[in-house]
Structure formats: structure tokens, C-alpha cells
Amino acid sequence: DLVLHSVTKYLAGHSDVILGALVTPPTDAGRALRERLEQHRLLHGAIAGPMETWLALRGLRTLHLRVERATATAGQLASRLGSHPAVGRVRYPGFGAIVAIEVAGGAEAAERVAAACRLWTHSTSLGGVESQVERRRRHPAEPATVPEGLLRLSVGIEDVEDLWRDLDRALRA
């Protein structure tokens, strides 16, 4: 097996590096694959620069703290959003820092909520220290199975009460 990690997201965690990592298993086949990948990298120059690797290492040092904080905050927000009158549905598996909500009122209401957020960055990315909101169905390429009013919330490490006040205010706007 070969595992591809997006170091850009949670591993680096500060939205300031674009990097990936390939991980091979500690087996004979895995070692053979790794040797082939290293040869390809050597011939084609696909290596990360020193600044990118330093930024990734910096992020790895705080990964456990960031994930712990963001996960706890996401759980609290998901619980509160479940009883909010402007939210039709909350999608949260009970772990992790991604919460999806369906805003009552569909696409226009979801756009208004996203635009009204002040602490939440309106962005497609995820896994950073800053909280981000995105309406997933904005782009024509999104499948019709994605609800029109769906907002994806990538929860960062800000104070839960600050994030809640901002979301609540935006949902009531």
C-alpha cells in the first residue's frame, strides 16, 4: 500500500505551505516501491525546499494540540448548532474538526450566513489554525447530491465562545 498525506492541511496546520508526503509500508514490496520513488525524485528533482520542510516540521510539533483543541470546539459547536432554528441539519460524526450544516432557506440563506461571518474565513481549504466556512455547492462541478444550503465549517483553534457568537450572529442575520 501507498499512503499519500496532504501535509498542507492538518500536518503543517498554518495555511502557509504546499506539500505532500508519500508513505510506504515496512515490507519488502514497500521498500522496493520506495526505492523506485526515490529514483524518480532524484531524476526529476521533485523535492521540497528547506523553508517548506521547516514549516511542516513546525506544524508537526503542535499537531496534537491543534487537533485536540479543534476537535473539542467542533463537538461543542455541532451540539449547539443542532438546536439552532436557522439550521436544518448538522452533519458531524462525533470526532474531528469538520462540521457540515444545512442552513434552512437553501443557497441564498447559506451565502448570507457565510458572508456575514467575521471570524470565519470564507475559504475552500481546511485544517489550519483559523476557522473557515465554505458553501460547497457554489461551483457548477459540485454534484447535485450536495445540498444547496450546505456549509462546511473547518474549525480552528480560536475560542469556542467567540466562534459560537459569530456563527449565531451570522445565522440570525
Model features per residue range: what roles?
Residues 66, 131-173:
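PLP-dependent enzyme catalytic core of the Aspartate aminotransferase-like
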